[in-house]
Curated annotation (Swiss-Prot):
Similarity annotation: Belongs to the UPF0398 family.
Classification of source organism: Bacteria, Bacillati, Bacillota, Bacilli, Lactobacillales
Organism: Lactobacillus helveticus (strain DPC 4571)
UniProt cross-references to Pfam families, sorted A to Z: YpsA
InterPro entries referenced in this protein's UniProt entry, alphabetically: YspA
Official protein name in the record: UPF0398 protein lhv_1265
Family matches, as Gene3D superfamilies: 3.40.50.450
């Protein structure tokens, strides 16, 4: 069984403040292409991600979409109970919708947020229950995901644990590829 931890930027770190932002289309396109490459080589059974607004929720959406065509399951893990309680109503609704649709949902702590140990326990759980990681993350532009990135780097010194990055250069390439593909489709209709 091949399990992939996916994490990355929060939506606000990418200046994405609405569901219609074109950056979301490009990031989802990049994720979908990455996942399809693994799926077509029998290297992916589970996508395991968090519930943060941004890359993690977009990952769950793409995983659910691909799960209709491929033998792929999607899991959302959260570091503590009542994770989304402080979010606005729209974001809470999106969270609850994803929670209901994924193949597996759980919290690594049965308590509401108490202290940073819960976050470290969550990270350790993700490392120990996955075989590799993908981050939408650029080391030249650190964000909150730098903690995950640094922990994975440290973990790799003791364990074989592949980490792939989709950075801003990759996203620019994907945007150009997406635009070309959609222009071809437009003109061929």
């Amino acid at each position: 069984m091949q399990r992939l931890w996916v994490t990355g930027y929060r939506s606000y770190e990418l200046n994405v403040f609405g569901d219609k932002d074109p950056k979301i289309i490009i990031i989802k396109y990049a994720l979908k292409n990455y996942f399809k490459g693994l799926l077509e080589n029998d290297q992916l059974d589970w996508i395991i991600t968090g519930a943060n607004l941004g890359v993690e929720q977009w990952t769950a959406e793409v995983g659910l979409e691909l799960g209709q065509k491929y033998p792929l399951r999607t899991s959302i893990m959260i570091p503590y109970e009542k994770f989304a309680d402080r979010w606005n109503e729209n974001n809470q609704t999106k969270f609850l919708n994803l929670k209901e649709r994924v193949d597996f949902f759980a919290s690594t702590s049965n308590l509401p947020y108490q202290n940073p140990v819960q976050l470290r326990n969550y990270q350790n759980f993700m490392l120990q229950h996955t075989d590799r990681a993908l981050m939408v993350y650029d080391t030249e532009h650190p964000g909150k995901s730098k903690y995950d990135y640094n922990l994975i780097q440290k973990y790799q010194k003791a364990e074989e644990y592949p980490l792939d990055l989709i950075d801003f250069y990759d996203l620019q390439d994907v945007a150009e590829e997406y635009q070309e593909a959609h222009q071809r489709n437009y003109f061929s209709e």
